[in-house]
Amino acid sequence: MLFEPALKPARLIQRYKRFLADVVTPDGEALTLHCPNTGAMTGCATPGDTVWYSASDNRKRRYPHSWELTETASGQWIGVNTLHANTLVGEALRAGTIPELAGYAHLRGEVRYGAENSRIDWLLSAEGRADCYIEVKSVTLLQHQSGYFPDAVTLRGQKHLRELQAMAEMGYRAVLFFAVLHSGIDRVSPARHIDPHYADLVLQAQQYGVEVLCYGCQLSRHGMRIHTPLPIIIS
């Protein structure tokens, strides 16, 4: 995906109330951005880092600017807008650049399914093949030279794992897909030190047939794309 129109830079002052961030542009203008990320954003919102933001022409929006990327002082790039993870995976599925998920004729997004009334991020189907349910998670937490998910306790994520396991038990393909939106991450693990129940559910779901995939992304102020598979360490 390309950022069009081009993103603009600013210096981060603070993130607060989860969905807001104060920044200062290179010409000294103070702005309040919408922060499209509900997580803890540990390591992604250090005051002084460079924020790259987009602008909306929707006059009804109270905060027309959105925080898209962080460029850290050490030169790492982080995708802050978690909505982009689904978009990136969808683009890669359509292009056939994820070999493990290639060969399906039909792709649908946000399809309702499961006993807990969830929505699957992507559903693949083809004649003669079992439907494939794909749940996408955005990974940005870097600690101890490894990436972790989640960065906070996630009841919603736990529900998604239960739903995926149920689909696998019914004979469908079920895939948990970690999209790594942090240039400094080269491997990923469930964050047992943050949400031990989520980590247990990942291990259990895998034992029942849920596939776990992890791909890194190329990130820049110009755009992003799914790039290369990364190791996933589950214990």
Curated annotation (Swiss-Prot):
Q: Which GO terms describe its molecular function?
A: DNA binding
Q: Which Gene3D superfamilies match?
A: 2.40.50.580, 3.40.1350.60
A Pfam family that the UniProt record links to this protein:
SfsA_N
Q: Which family does it belong to?
A: Belongs to the SfsA family.
Q: What is this protein called?
A: Sugar fermentation stimulation protein homolog
What taxonomic classification does the UniProt entry list for its organism? Bacteria, Pseudomonadati, Pseudomonadota, Gammaproteobacteria, Enterobacterales
